[in-house]
Amino acid sequence: MEAGKLMRTCGLWTVALAQLAFSADAAPPRPVETILADYVKAVGGYQAVDRLTSRETVADVHHGGRVTLYWRKPNQVLSMSKNERTGYDGTRGWTLSKKRKVKKLARGAEVPIEMDADPLRYVHIHDFYGELNPAPPGEIDGERMDVIVAPNNLSATKLYFDARSHLLRRVDESGEVSAYFENRVDYLDYREVDGVRLPFRILHTTTEPGGASEDLRIKTITHNMALQPEMFSKPQAGQVVMGGRR
């Protein structure tokens, strides 16, 4: 009789624990503004981020040589490698090939460069996403993530924030750069530089056929050097674009 009671008691505890686990998994998502407030605090706070006016990032691309990225507040960016230079002056983008041929950058093609040169852009996420909605928690590599969804006309961008560190871990973009394919950016290996926390590894992947992955390993980051605005402007054909500090 006692054994029967014990078995029934154990059974009830098993059901109760299962219900608790289900309730935890089914917990409502955290509010968007709470997730964002935790993120801003984790990277150093508004004051620390907003005092930065420019950035030079030197990185090695895995199996792809060295690249130098420049960012000038609010959204001018320049990427310089041995064979190519790509810039965005805040209005239009361009690419200068090794043969000094200048081409117009396709719509939205500047976004991946902005994400590399200024990963802290998401501190002011409301500047470029008109609508932000909470989503059920996700998981990356066994770690729980808070998720925010920014819908667009074709699909949505999903942003994953580590539930423990509150740092931005991943951005899955669909419908902005491409109507058909998903582009993913993973931010890894955060370190403190000048009072803010920045990723020192940025991994790009895409579902686009033939699209190349890119693994950016950052070597140095320098803030608040003087950068001339014309270095981000579209050059004339044959003109050499000079980058670096002024």
Task: Pin down the residues of each PLM region.
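N-terminal secretory signal peptides that target proteins for export/translocation
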Residues: 1-7
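Short, basic/low-complexity N-terminal boundary segments at the transition from targeting/disordered tails
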Residues: 53-55, 59-68, 113-123, 163-175
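N-terminal mature ectodomain segment of secretory-pathway/periplasmic proteins
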Residues: 27-101, 128-136
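Gram-negative outer-membrane assembly/targeting C-terminal domains
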Residues: 233-246
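Acidic/charged, solvent-exposed loop-and-adjacent secondary-structure segments enriched in E/D, K/R, S/T
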Residues: 95-122
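Bacterial N-terminal signal peptides
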Residues: 10-21
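Gly/Pro-enriched, hydrophobic low-complexity segments
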Residues: 141-235
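Short, conserved active-site entrance elements at the starts or edges of catalytic domains
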Residues: 112-147, 167-170
